[in-house]
């Protein structure tokens, strides 16, 4: 049997299934840490000198591919009256129990995988790099301060500040600070008083709308594996793609994307960019857990094979 490779994610999730098949085709022994089954149906143990999946020690893993691990604050129902039923039953009476259990689960999984890294296992991507997907404003600041071209950005809960920003940059798009919803254009309907007051509930990220087309770039290690224009009639192309057009990045742009990946502490990324009509590229985000099967199927780009090479190297 060849090298042992771990996969963190749902055992039946498409990317986990696919990478398991690719790695086993290379002779690897693949161990799936099924995050969907833990803790109810998957035993994991952290000891002073060992990390165990069931009774199977994992410190001899050569590498781990982290496909999905929920690394954010657990959800809880803030307003218990929303759960009150006509008969008086409170649906969310035990929300604090669920909240605490999920918090414990996330803390355990995060420490479990990070400890494997401390014990010499190659982690792709390091759990700490997922911070910058959850902390999108910090990622933008890191990239901008390093000279990476990113959109002009304003995150605020102040309606007056938003109005001034919109006047300054013209066309504006917005999205949640932590992600989880599609990017949308700011319209006059968003700038009415009752709509703006919703910012008092939670801030949002507002950015200049960069004209041009969407480009997805996959990087593994220091290699740009593919760069593709994604055609869509919608601002947020996810799920609405109408075509894929592979392109060759200018060397300086390829170098810029690799540098951005490194700044974010990533070994593998799917980076989102905009290609402006004047030929300039603007980086939107580096994703630590990028989906790639659709791109492999649409363009034949060897993202999966290159990722397998990196895990086995």
Regions found by a protein language model. Give the residues of each.
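Phosphate-binding site of ATP-dependent enzymes
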Residues: 23, 167-261
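Short acidic-glycine loop/turn motifs at beta-strand connectors
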Residues: 27, 47-48, 219-223, 276-279
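C-terminal active-site "lid" helix and adjoining low-complexity regulatory extension at the edge
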Residues: 262-266, 275-313
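Loop-centered beta-sheet repeat module
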Residues: 129-183
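Short hydrophobic segments within beta-strands
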Residues: 7-8, 220
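Protein kinase-like catalytic core scaffold
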Residues: 123, 172, 225, 269, ...
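Extreme N-terminal starter segment of soluble prokaryotic enzymes
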Residues: 2-6
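Conserved N-proximal alpha/beta basic substrate-recognition cap immediately N-terminal to
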Residues: 10-22, 33-149
């Amino acid at each position: 049997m060849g090298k042992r490779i771990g996969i963190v994610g749902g055992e039946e999730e498409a990317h986990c299934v696919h990478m398991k098949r690719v790695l086993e085709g290379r002779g690897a022994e693949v161990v799936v840490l099924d995050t969907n089954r833990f803790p109810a149906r998957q035993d994991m143990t952290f000891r002073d000198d060992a990390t165990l999946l069931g009774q199977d020690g994992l410190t001899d893993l050569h590498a781990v591919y982290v496909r999905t691990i929920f690394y954010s604050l657990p959800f809880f129902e803030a307003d218990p009256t929303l759960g009150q039923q006509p008969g008086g039953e409170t649906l969310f009476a035990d929300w604090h129990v669920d909240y605490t259990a999920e918090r414990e689960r996330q803390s355990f999984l995060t420490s479990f995988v990070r400890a494997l890294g401390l014990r010499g296992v190659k982690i792709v991507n390091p759990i700490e790099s997922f911070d910058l997907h959850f902390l999108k404003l910090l990622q933008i600041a890191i990239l901008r301060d390093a000279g990476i071209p990113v959109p002009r950005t304003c995150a605020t809960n102040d309606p007056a500040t938003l109005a001034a920003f919109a006047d300054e940059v013209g066309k504006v798009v917005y999205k949640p600070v932590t992600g989880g919803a599609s990017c949308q254009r700011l319209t006059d309907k968003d700038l009415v008083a009752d709509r703006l007051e919703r910012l008092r509930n939670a801030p949002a990220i507002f950015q200049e709308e960069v004209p041009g087309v969407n480009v997805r770039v996959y990087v593994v290690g220091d290699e740009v594996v593919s760069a593709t224009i994604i055609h869509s009639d919608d601002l947020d192309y996810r799920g609405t793609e109408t075509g894929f057009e592979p392109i060759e990045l200018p060397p300086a742009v390829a170098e810029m994307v690799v540098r951005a990946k490194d700044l974010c502490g990533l070994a593998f990324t799917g980076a989102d960019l905009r290609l402006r009509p004047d030929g300039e590229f603007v980086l939107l985000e580096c994703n630590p857990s990028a989906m790639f099967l659709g791109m492999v199927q649409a363009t034949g780009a060897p993202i999966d094979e290159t990722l397998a090479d990196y895990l086995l190297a």
